[in-house]
Amino acid sequence: MRPTTSTQNICARCLNRGRHFSTNVQHRAQQPSNAIVSSPPQTGYARLTNRGLISITGIDSTTFLQGLITQNMLVANDPNRAIRRTGTYAAFLNSQGRVLNDAFIYPMPRVDGGAAAPEDPAWLVEVDKCEVSSLMKHLKKHKLRSKLKLRALEDGERTVWSSWKDHTEPRWAAYNLESESSSQFSPSSPIAGCVDTRAPGFGSRIVTPGGEDLRMHFPDEAQVAGGEVDLGAYTVRRMLHGIAEGQSEIIRESALPLECNMDMARGVDFRKGCYVGQELTIRTHHTGVVRKRIVPVQLYTGAQDTVPVDGLPAYDSSVEVPSPPSGTNISKVGARKGRSAGKFLGGVGNIGLALCRLEMMTDIVLTSEGTQYNPETEFKVSWTAADEGPVGPSDSGEVKIKAFVPPWLREYIASGGVRNTARKIDNEDAQRARELLYQLDEEEELRRNE
């Protein structure tokens, strides 16, 4: 079995949206293909056909988004409260503080079917293509009497790209996440974009009009380097950096933003005003401990060569590894029962992403209570045909799994995740935050055992 990518133009959740095979809450990986996924080049760009766009235009569009997303739509520390003119990573949450959609928000001068006046703000929201209709419903529910227009863009109207260049990955502390540099595109430009802050040196996000190759818009090699690669190569690169994307990996109404590293990725502004789902996110940041985070993992079998000891997983397109279904629990090898060590989210070949208990699967120490980590302990993902449902592989299987903490995430955690000045919170608030976290953990265990 050759390594395959689970990210295609149309995901299995879209294909099965009208099917009702089971009432169990199980999030599946997308249907694997038989294509061999090549290793990503050090320099290149990819057309992200798995992403969709929604335009939000009108005089109230900025205020509307400000109340719905985790990011600040205003320029930080600006006494005039100017509207930001740079793209940004963000998330939409439900009222319980769980992620509905991860997104990129881009300022646009005016898009088709847009603002009532040219001077009115206009925004593009980039989201998982399978989630465009769900997010549109969420936006319409909160629109009320706001003076704005919502529209899902058709295929071919605009194209989303990821572009990256060959350079050494910087350390998190040296990565200027707080900068509000001006956009590289003029306000009148039809092209939008931003730095992809989800990992240091990961590259840029670009949205171009039409479906032409990115080179048509950026002929200069200094602007966009390398050649175009397929979506699978981008996915491998993304997973090697520990970046989850879309609702097959950031599970809708289940994932928490800090567990998805959105704090490290500058996807959450902890100083802005109220927005939907803010309370738990802010309390966790200031008083709680994030015990689980999404990290890159290596899949291997007993007969396989040794896995890297530290650093990052190594992708090898020639390695044959069974592909676990998304949402499968991770457990210790040899353990009959016990607390789940994490959850496998998706993968390509012998690498992937998993939501892992850091003090169980890695050497990260979060509190003075001690850690359960033992470097000799191995972990596994086991599944049966019944677990996989209608879109998974037809056979049962088991594969070993090893978690890695990228250097920038390790440094961020070691720093205490302090990027903003924290306000003082009294003991009652701190206790309430801890109780909420324990309650969420218990709910997660109950869902898993149903």
Curated annotation (Swiss-Prot):
Per the record, the domain of life is Eukaryota
**GO terms, biological process:** iron-sulfur cluster assembly
Q: Which GO terms describe its cellular component?
A: mitochondrial matrix
User: Does Transit peptide appear among the keywords?
Assistant: yes
Which InterPro entries does the record match to this protein? TrmE/GcvT_dom1 (IPR027266), YgfZ/GcvT (IPR045179), YgfZ/GcvT_CS (IPR017703)
Give compartment(s): Mitochondrion matrix
Keywords (alphabetical) are:
Mitochondrion, Transit peptide
Outline where the chain's transit peptide begins and ends.
1-21
- The record lists the membrane-crossing segments as none
Q: GO: which molecular function terms? A: transferase activity
Under Pfam families, the record lists: Beta-barrel_CAF17_C (PF25455)
- Where is this chain primarily localised? mitochondrion
Work out whether the entry's keyword set contains Membrane.
no
Query: What NCBIfam families does this protein's entry cite?
Result: ygfZ_signature (TIGR03317)
Family named by the database record: Belongs to the GcvT family. CAF17/IBA57 subfamily.
- UniProt protein name: Iron-sulfur cluster assembly factor IBA57 homolog, mitochondrial
Gene name of the encoded protein: caf17
